[in-house]
Amino acid sequence: MNEQELCKKKLIDLSRQANRKGIVLFSDFLNLNELNIYHQNEKFFETKTEASGGVPFAERQIVAFIPDALYYEWQFPIAYLEIVPSYPKFAEKLGHRDILGSLMNLGVDRSKLGDIVICDDKYFLICEESMASYFIENLDKIRHTVVKLSPVTADALEQQQKFEEKDGIITSNRLDSMIACVYKFSRS
């Protein structure tokens, strides 16, 4: 059985379990390929579904399987952590791969991690609620920078995200043309 079939069966099984038990069940964080499989197979689910990555435009998302007879409030099991250098004066500039590498070095499965958001000199991690305390206790160094993690709210993270609207003329419906227009790069 290939990876796509396995993902499809896993999602359908979660839907059946949620329907049978009458409770909301959640997937792990799904990557873009798994989200594509989820969207292609929504017609096979026995429950309603909803996907969220914790912030708008999140790349990695959790899917909630919601039974029809649901009568209680629920929330996505998502935690938001801010990564702060303990000694800002001596801190290195960290990148996405530095943070992800340190998290993976803790032996954590990638499916427990959501997006890593970097805004200016602030770093945020979106993860499953069940893993937040583990990261707070065990992640103390990224590259050569000593760090501490602290929980924040989704609002604090959303305030850090900045979007910019760009106007321009795109000569063809190709990705390289769009990137050239937005970032003022030559296509060559």
Where does each model-flagged region fall?
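Ferredoxin-like alpha/beta domains used as RNA- or RNAP-binding modules
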Residues: M1-F185
